[in-house]
Amino acid sequence: MQKLVIHGGAKLQGEISISGAKNAALPVLCASLLTADTFTIQNLPHLRDITTMLALLEQIGVRILTNDPGTAELSAASITNPTASYDMVKTMRAAILVLGPLLARTGQAYISLPGGCAIGMRPVDQHIKGLQAMGADISIEQGYIRAQAGRLSGTRIVMDLVTVTGTENLMMAATLASGTTILENAAREPEVVDLADCLIGMGAKIEGAGSDIIVIEGVDHLHGSSHTVMPDRIETGTFLTAVAACGGDITLTRTRADTLDVVLGKLIETGAAIDTGEDWIRLRMQHRPQPVSLRTAPYPAFPTDMQAQFMALNSIADGTSVMTETIFENRFMHVQELKRLNADIQVEGNTAIVHGIPQLDGASVMATDLRASACLIIAGLVAQGETIVDRIYHLDRGYERIERKLAQAGAQIKRIN
């Protein structure tokens, strides 16, 4: 099993190029199911979840015409098997995103209930209830969602809670429904906007993406298109947080500052100096960070996917911070691993109280999920001595060659078998 070996203490300098966003690329790949025409996706990150999704689409009947680095050309002219098996879905919960497009395009879908990260319950009931409201007949049989429908009908759907994948699934399904669909309490994430832009490029009629009310007027068919996936705002935030913790001067390219307003604000609170341009962000940090308290919430508030990285930073900050997680239960599993590095953290329910100390000490730690992996890397970069991060297969689900990018910025980090 592969591990990362990190020798802490180096400042990070130079330039890092940001990859396409996994959480934008996955629904965009699924959007290829909505048209019989050729569909091209650019700026695809090279990640395990992307490879898994492409394999799933091939099983469904999509032909991968080209799969060059960063680009995939897809043809869903013949969907022969509208099924996502448990073996395929169990490692990637985003596979649920084929449900809406398959049902809208073929009138049927047989989808295993999803797996993915072990960070708490992420129910798909909002997907199912929304599709049922559009006229689908859906049942749960032996761990599978069995869905059938004629042409879906537009309707008003008020979601009980904010769900990104639920919003994306229903938005895709509604593009081919008869009439108008109104999604209320919709997710506002930039990845939802990116998917809407992709669908509009295919001929969909969508208004309001980026707000909590999205209106979709169904059309008879969608056509082929080419779409460039947005930059990964979480990868961007992860590297910025690493520099704020370690110190240094880094410029991130091929990224967007406008998707990270709250994160950038919190980094400025730590004492970092930040400059931004149209497609770049520069962060400079010359001293020990100040602590930042935060509360995760749906976009545009502080993202849950950045909570763990900020906990690593707060572990060595000059003071005490309070961090509250409101999105997922069980998303403090990295706390016990940080404590192995001598971090001073107490967890009370969904809140962690972090008392910053001047220096973490290197040790062997184990990654429990994707963002916890990034947290432990940042902690290892600031720790004294050697840190070994085990179970890094989580990393390859969401970060493209993170150790190489950090190494080119001066980090002493390498992957070993």
Swiss-Prot record:
It catalyses: phosphoenolpyruvate + UDP-N-acetyl-alpha-D-glucosamine = UDP-N-acetyl-3-O-(1-carboxyvinyl)-alpha-D-glucosamine + phosphate. It holds the Pfam family EPSP_synthase. The keyword Transcription does not apply. Pathway: Cell wall biogenesis; peptidoglycan biosynthesis. Disulfide bonds: none annotated. The active site is at 117 (proton donor). Cell wall formation. Adds enolpyruvyl to UDP-N-acetylglucosamine. This is UDP-N-acetylglucosamine 1-carboxyvinyltransferase. The lineage of its organism: Bacteria, Pseudomonadati, Pseudomonadota, Betaproteobacteria, Nitrosomonadales. The gene is murA.
